[in-house]
Amino acid sequence: MKVFFVTHATSKDNEDKSASGWKDVELSELGLQQARERGETFKDIKLDLICCSDLKRAVHTVQIAFGQKYPVIVDKRLRELNYGDFNGKPREVVEGMKKERISEPFPNGESYEQAVGRIHDFCH
């Protein structure tokens, strides 16, 4: 079995240099184009299944890239890290906090260890 890991296309928060986390934001114009290009990249590869988070940026990337060509599992456990009170804050603020958040959750959010556990739960 081959597994491809692909991130969502560029979101409006990515362009604004915000740490989206669990903030549900749309793709930017660039992201819409990237999603179309992603579909082209995979056009000659047969996929059995696509899995993505339930956030708009992930779902829209899949919809634009692949349409209804493949079955899709949308699952909250595949979300990015929950920065809690820092969802949507400037990326530079969040970047400076990451090392201390490996085991210790972001306020009203989660730690990196918790995120890994959540994704591990999905995979098993």
Regions found by a protein language model. Name each.
Residues 6-7, 75:
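Active-site neighborhood of phospho(di)ester-bond hydrolases with catalytic His/Asp-centered motifs
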Residues 7-70, 110-119:
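Active-site-proximal alpha-helix that buttresses catalytic centers in soluble enzyme cores
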